Amino acid sequence: MGEFGFIAKIAELFASVDHHGWEAIGDDCTVLPLGDEALVITTDMLIEDVHFLRDKITPEELGRKALSVNLSDVAAMGVRPVATLLSVALPKDAVGEWAERFARVYHALSEEYSVALVGGDTTSSKDGISINVVAIGRGPLSNIKRRSAACVGDVVYVGGELGASARGLKDILEGNEDTPNVAVHRNPQAQVAEGEWLGSRAEVRAMMDLSDGLASDLCHILRASKCGAELYAEQIPAVDGDIESAVAGGEDYKLLFTVKEDAAAELESDFLSHFGRPIYRVGRIVESASYTIRWFNAGVEFSPDWKGFTHF
């Protein structure tokens, strides 16, 4: 069945239940329209020995990561995060100093983004650390970006360089923990300001964040929008030239979005002026009955075996 097949089964099972105004499963967050505004909510888990190795990450790094990955989902909807709920399951050896160090950094990052902690839960664990964060965002309903909004002819963009996190994890597993890529892997940076800014731009159509890798995540937009894509390998901003890590590695937490073709150049210029760094044009949306990606390098089509991360 796989991870996404399981999610589809759950969505189908609950389709008959009254959503009370909430939108159904399918985006980085669910959306509740409230007049001209909207609330968005997302949740994400971090499980020891699945998402992190405790002896390879500090409590501070894990606190930052736990919050950042959820803020990234809110940013991908085009609005500002405003609050979180935090639930933790801790074994005895993580209670006390470890938990306090985790909480201090979670608090510091919350303060940086003006995101309140408004609830949660704590419990003991007999088998490792588990962390669950619920993040809430708020903004104009007109700014909400959905995966289903891409149109044929749109330009595909990513919000920064890709592959550093995957290369950092590889360095850690090889015992080389003092590299720039390791620092990126351990301290992900959500594109919060960028997401809110892109949300305000009508020419930006579909958007999501890159958590499982470009090769996997773009397919979510394609299936939701019922179209295909061409990606140009030579234009992908791959860290250290490692294209496979850039498209299949995951945990980059950069924004992936599509833009109306006739407004793309102006958006690029405005983004550069506003943030002092570029966005990267990596492909375009095309017609496709199979909702798949076609890969090109310098105009020559090829068929790589690049797949993003899945849990099942």
List the predicted regions and their residue ranges:
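Helix-biased detector of long, well-ordered alpha-helical tracts
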Residues: M1-F312
